Amino acid sequence: MSGNSIGKLFSVTSFGESHGPAIGCIVDGCPPGLTLSVEDIQQELDRRKPGTSRHVTQRREADRVEILSGVFENTTTGTPIALLIRNEDQRSKDYSKIMDVFRPGHADYTYWQKYGIRDYRGGGRSSARETAVRVAAGAIARKWLQQRYGIVIRGYMAQLGSIAIPFKSWDVVNQNPFFVADNDYVQKLETFMDSLRKSGNSAGARINVVAEGVPVGWGEPVYDRLDADIAYAMMSINAVKGVEIGAGFNSITQKGTEHSDEITPEGFLSNNAGGILGGISSGQPVVVSVAIKPTSSIRLARRSIDKAGNPVLVETHGRHDPCVGIRATPIVEAMLAIVLMDHALRHRAQNADVVCSTPRIPGSTTNQIHPVEMQASAPRAEDPEPDESS
C-alpha cells in the first residue's frame, strides 16, 4: 500500500491498524532546536482520545505517546521523529460476524477488491484510529508555527446533524465535549445525541478551523496551491466528504462586488477568499470548513453482500462514534498545521530573500474568521441591477 505520507519538506508517514499492537508515524523535516516534550503532544491527543463522553466511542484508549527518536533532552535534533501510540483496548471479537460481509458506507468492499485481503477488525488501516497519530504530528507543527510565526490554529464544531451552532467565543470551545463555540447549545446537542444513540442511527457534522497569523506569501502555484494542499489534507481524513475555503459554496450565489475582498491601506474589508488568493496566503486568517458524513457503523440493519456476492443484512455492533465529528476538531486542526508548516519551510527555502516594495497591509480585522458574517457588515458599493439586454 502506497499513499501513507503527506508533505514535501515537512512530511508525515503513518502506520498501523485499529486492532494492531500500535499505531505511529515518522515526522521528517522538523528543524532542529524546537523545544518539544511528550506533554506538548499529549495535551493535543487528550483532546481527541476516545471515551471522553457518553456521546463518543467507549473504547478506552489512553493514547499515551512515546517519542522514539529525533528528540534529545527535550529538543528536536533535525532527524526523523518517530512517534508511537500503543493500542490497549481492542475487542476484535466484536467484528467476527462481519469478517465475510461488507458494511455499507465503509471501505470493506473497496479494500477487498483492491488488495484481495482486508483486516476486518475495527476497519484495520481504514479506521479513524489512525487519526491519533495525525494529531500527534500536528502538535509538533503547531508548536513550531506558534513559536516561529505566532500562528494560532483553532477549530470548532459549527453544525451537528441539522443543528447549526453559531460562533460565540473561542473561550468555551474546550469547555464542552462537542467543541462548540456557544455553551448555550450544549444541552440541545446532548439531547439530540441521546436520542440518536437510542435510535441506533448516526449523524454528520461541520467543523470550521481558522489559522490566524499566517504571513502573506505561502503557497506554490500552480498545482501546489496552499488551498489545494489544504483540501487534499482535509479530504484524507476519514469520513470527510467536502471542504470549503472561505465563503466556499456560498460563492455561487454571491456577486463579484460581494465576493471579491476589497483592499484598503488599513487592510482587507472582508475575507471571502479565506485568506488565500491565487493559491498564496494573503496574510488574512486562513478559514477552512469540512463536512463529515454520518458514521457508517450503525446498529440498524442495512442491505449489502457477502464475499460470495450473496445479499445479506448487516448490523454493526461494537463501540462506535454515533457522530465522528464530535472528536474531529483536533484532527482538522492538526492537518491544517501540517500543511502550513510544510509550506512555511518551502517558502523559506525558495523565497526567504524576496523583498517587495509594496507595504504589507494588515491581514486581520474584526470578524474575518467568519466570512459570511463579514459580508453583511463590510461597507460595499450598491450592486447594479443586471442588464437584461445583455
Curated annotation (Swiss-Prot):
Subunit-structure text: Homotetramer.
Binding residue positions for FMN: R125, S126, S127, N238, A239, G278, K293, P294, T295, S296, S297, R319
Species this chain originates from: Nitrosomonas europaea (strain ATCC 19718 / CIP 103999 / KCTC 2705 / NBRC 14298)
Function recorded in the entry: This reaction introduces a second double bond into the aromatic ring system.
The encoding gene: aroC
EC primary class: lyase
Family: Belongs to the chorismate synthase family.
Ranges for region Disordered: 359-390
Annotated binding of NADP(+), by residue: R48, R54
Protein's name according to its UniProt entry: Chorismate synthase
